[in-house]
Every structure is written in structure tokens, then in C-alpha cells.
Amino acid sequence: MKVPSPSVREAASMYGTAVAIFLVILVAALQGSEPPESPFPYRIPLDPEGTLELSWNVSYVQETIHFQLLVRELKAGVLFGMSDRGELENADLVVLWTDGDSAYFGDAWSDQKGWIHLDAQQDYQLLRAQRTPEGLSLLFKRPFGTCDPKDYLIEDGTVHLVYGILEEPFWSLEAINTSALHTGLQRVQLLKPNVSVPALPADMRTMEVRAPDVLVPGQETTYWCYITELPDGFPRHHIVMYEPIVTEGNEALVHHMEVFQCAAEFESFPQFNGPCDSKMKPSRLNYCRNVLAAWALGAKAFYYPEEAGLAFGGAGSSRFLRLEVHYHNPLKIEGRRDSSGIRLYYTATLRRFDAGIMELGLVYTPVMAIPPQETAFVLTGYCTDKCTQLALPPSGIHIFASQLHTHLTGRKVVTVLARDGREREVVNRDDHYSPHFQEIRMLKKVVSVHPGDVLITSCTYNTEDRKLATVGGFGILEEMCVNYVHYYPQTQLELCKSAVDPGFLQKYFHFVNRFNGEEVCTCPQASVPEQFATVPWNSFNRQVLSALYGFAPISMHCNRSSAVRFQGDWNLQPLPEIISKLEEPTPRCPASRGRSPAGPTVVDIGGGKG
């Protein structure tokens, strides 16, 4: 259908009071299938001002998401959508806009220059537009996958949501360019696992670990650290659940929070309450790294399986806890107070199993490096069959949650389980991973790991903005590739990671010298980062390094909780032999789509259907 287009002068004359009144009285103008009976369990603010709020629920049976978008201060329209990394270009969008006479709701997309186009396949279905005391509420749905090349495939991992505010009418959807709008992005996991809530113990108690009335700095990013401690003589307990406590009014400010337990070998830790990067922060706080709880925007309460709990308190456990809160304050608001934190639910009735946390992936070492100017360079770390055979109990372990972690150049992380040389299943995968959005995620399905299994963790990096090689290490400009898996029963195996054998890396430096006129320093006193810094990064040297990581022996770290390796020969270990890999997931098209509209849905001023 052709959308009517009044003249520019007519549109301008209609703008103002008429547009505002028209959009405010938009009440139930559209009729469609009713939303599911279940409420909207997930809710996030989209913009820092809190004028846009998104709620949603997930139907795995229908493979559909129902969205509810609340627009508190509607001007001339709004756009919402998804893109690969949060760009407004090449985005999958749904737009509510007005031309001055009528309003339209339509599935759209933006091109590489930010111009918006109506999608020929209308996959966003508007179910209801309703004025509420809070603002205009838009209820619509969309399948996970549509098989429309202009649409975003909604997957299990991180989704980069984008939004835009239309402040004036547009005579046509094609007249809108995202660069002229007030826009932004928000990261979230849309496809939350449908995990049933386990029974909770009758003697359950709570403990709140909260920031003590923090005056949030008026800068875009702040990591705030606060040290607290358990009561004297606090006995051993099991954490069975935790949930966020966000100060009312700060929902758009608190991005993520973590509670760490400090190292038991220190009898005391100094008190601290301030920015984590402060020069006044005691260095001993760097030994508070054992994660007890982690929450990120959009996440709900985290439950441990009925048969397991995370132990804390008692002998051999530190009394000291560190709370870390990430404040995201792009508007640089001054004077805001915050007492957000995490509420721990714990029981003195210990469950059958202690839960454990194991590190998978790559060792923090500069021998694993990413050349500069790479768009998708892959590094892989192994937890080998030799290590799991030695360190896991005969009945194996059961992974129920996972937290992926890289530094700034990480773009994708996946861990797969292999058995008898064949990849069997994915433990966790995030194809749109962002280092700015990290949370402990419940797995849809518990993954059982048997002695002799292999766990393979691969990270994909983008270093297009780097001039030198990015080496592995603890620094924020260095890189990591880690999956912290949460499992039960707890074992002595705390770290199962690898890195290329250092001797073979030196052979790489000597080898590329033959083709580069001794440009790479291989002198004994040169460090590995210094050697990488002198490599001329032509295509040959890049390919050889990638090939080296794909065949060279590895140094295996099969470590106990005491940071001591299990007994055995762990150097110059061959890479696990994988004879069969999992196929890449194939998007599923909706079985029956029904009749989608040929164009946008039109709503006239009187509330009738267009």
C-alpha cells in the first residue's frame, strides 16, 4: 500500500499541538492477537533519562518474544531495534512515526548510511497501542528468526538493542536518517533460560552487601569498590540464591555489580570505599577475586540447583568481601546518591554438594597474542582429557552456569565439550559478546563433564584500532579468554587452561626473521611483548602465527585451588585431536507466519484502524 504523504508545509502546520494530542490519545487503536497470559518478567531502561522502558517475555514453544515498550514522554515517534554491535547503521528496526496527519507502525531497516527503509517482510506485529498513566505502551511481538536478510537473528547470547527519539514529523519513513536522531544502545540477554525456581530452605537468611550511600561521580564510567566483612565467627553456610538491590531512581545508572570474597591467606584487609582505580586503593584489595555473585542489567535472581550451594564462611574462608559496582553515567549526572548492591540468600543447612567455580580458556600470558588490524582473530584454550581424567571424580561434574570474560577486543566466545574426539555440545556461546556486558548466565541445560572429556574455549578478537600486537595478560589493554563455569560437586580442579609452548613461539620469531631481514628481536634479554612489537605484520606473518596456534604443542595448567598443578608432565602437550566438529547453528524460519501486512499499520487521529 502507498503511504499518504502531505506536503512539507502541511506537515509543518500540523506539527505541534495536533501531533502531541494525536499521539497522546492513541488508545487501543490496533487490534491483534492477545499477548500470552504470563507477565513480562524482564525489564530494563533503554535510555539514561529513563523515558524509554522495555519489558519482555520469551516463548520457546512459539519461538517468539513479546515486547512491551513504554514511552514516557512521546514526541513525534520512536524507533527500537537490534544490530550486530549496537550501530544505528545496518540495524533491524521497528518504527512508530507520524507524518503530521497519521501515525504508522512498521518493520524497517537502516542502510550503511543510516537511512531508514520499510521492510518488505513485516515481522514485527503490533498487538496493542495503549495510553497508560505512565505513558504510551506499545505491545508487539517478533519471532526469534525470520529468514529475512534484513532482520537480526535473536540468539542466546548478548543482544545490542538500539533506540531513537523522533522529535518532529517526517513526510516519509525514507526521509529519516538515524544520524539526525537522539539515539543510544543497551546490551541485554533477551533469551533468558526457562529454568524452574528450585525449592528454598525454610531456614534461609539474607545478607545485603551494599554500597554505603555512594556519591556517584559525574563521569561516564565509574567502578566503585567497597570492602565489608562477615561477622566474627561466621560459620560455614551455603549461598542458595542472590538478587540485585538497585536504589530507586538509579535503574539506568547501575550497569552491573559483583561480590568477591578475598583470599583466605590474609588475616585482614584494609577498609576501603572509593573508585576502584583510585591511587588510594590498598593493593591488597587485588587479592579479592573469588566471585560469590555477579549481576548485570536485565538479569533477575540467580538460583543454585537444589542439590548444591556456594560455600562461604567457616574455617579456611576469608571474612572479607569486596563489592564492585559499575556506574554507567553518560549524562554525567552530578549529586546522585546510591546504595545499590546484592542480597545473598544463605542457609546453615548445607546441601548435598558444594558448588565450585572453574576457570577454562587461556593462561594469562603474552605468548598468546593477536596481531593488529585484525577483524576476527581466534585464540583457543584447552582443558585437556589428560587433566579431566586425573582431576575429576568418576561420576564427573555438572555445569549449570557460566560467565564469559575477555578484555576490550573480545567479540565472540564459545566453549564446547568434546568426548572421544568428537564435539558433543556447546557449554556456552555468545556470538555478540561485549566486554562491557558480563554476567553469570544460567545454562538452558546442565552440561555433564566426564573424566577424559575435553573443554575447548575459543575467543574471537577485533584489533582494527590497534597499531601493535595485543598480548595476553592482566592489563586492560592486554587480553584474556576465560569461561568461569559454575558446577557441582566441587573438586580440587580450579583452573584448567593452556597456552602455546614458549619454545615453539621462539621458533616462530626465528622463522619469520628469515623473511624479514632479522627485523624481529630474538635476543635472550628481549621479552615476548617486545618481540611481538617488532614483528612486521604482513599477511604472511599473520598467517604463520595463526597456524602456529593451531598445531604447536601447549603448556597445560591443570591447577588445584592452591595454584599448584596436579602431578604430571604438563609441558609440550599435543593439542587434543578433534575428528568431528559441531555444525554451526542454522536459523529456523517460523513454521507458519500468518499473513503479514503489506506495509506499515496506519492509525488515524480518531482512533480507527487504517
From Swiss-Prot:
GO biological process: dopamine catabolic process; norepinephrine biosynthetic process; octopamine biosynthetic process
Region (Disordered) residue spans: 586-610
Sites where the protein binds Cu(2+) B: 405, 407, 480
CDD domains: DOMON_DOH (cd09631)
Post-translational modification note: Proteolytic cleavage after the membrane-anchor leads to the release of the soluble form. N-glycosylated.
InterPro entries membership: Cu2_ascorb_mOase-like_C, Cu2_ascorb_mOase_CS-1, Cu2_ascorb_mOase_CS-2, Cu2_ascorb_mOase_N, Cu2_ascorb_mOase_N_sf, Cu2_monoox_C, DBH-like, DOH_DOMON
UniProt pathway annotation: Catecholamine biosynthesis; (R)-noradrenaline biosynthesis; (R)-noradrenaline from dopamine: step 1/1
SMART domains in alphabetical order: DoH (SM00664)
Compartments where found: Cytoplasmic vesicle, Secretory vesicle membrane; Cytoplasmic vesicle, Secretory vesicle, Chromaffin granule membrane
Keyword Magnesium tagged: no
Disulphide connectivity of cysteines: 147-589, 225-276, 262-288, 383-496, 387-558, 459-481
Residues marked Cleavage (site): 32-33
Bilayer topology annotation: Single-pass type II membrane protein
Pfam families xref list: Cu2_monoox_C, Cu2_monooxygen, DOMON
Glycosylated residues in this chain: 57, 177, 194
Record-annotated active site: 223, 405
UniProt GO MF annotations: copper ion binding; dopamine beta-monooxygenase activity; L-ascorbic acid binding
Keyword set, alphabetical order: Catecholamine biosynthesis, Copper, Cytoplasmic vesicle, Disulfide bond, Glycoprotein, Membrane, Metal-binding, Monooxygenase, Oxidoreductase, Secreted, Signal-anchor, Transmembrane, Transmembrane helix, Vitamin C
Annotated positions binding Cu(2+) A: 255-256, 326
Taxonomic superkingdom: Eukaryota
Principal localisation: membrane
Tissue localization of expression: Detected in adrenal medulla chromaffin cells.
Role noted for this protein: Catalyzes the hydroxylation of dopamine to noradrenaline (also known as norepinephrine), and is thus vital for regulation of these neurotransmitters.
UniProt family annotation: Belongs to the copper type II ascorbate-dependent monooxygenase family.
Oligomer and partners: Homotetramer; composed of two disulfide-linked dimers.
Protein name, entry field: Dopamine beta-hydroxylase
Upper classification of the organism: Eukaryota, Metazoa, Chordata, Craniata, Vertebrata
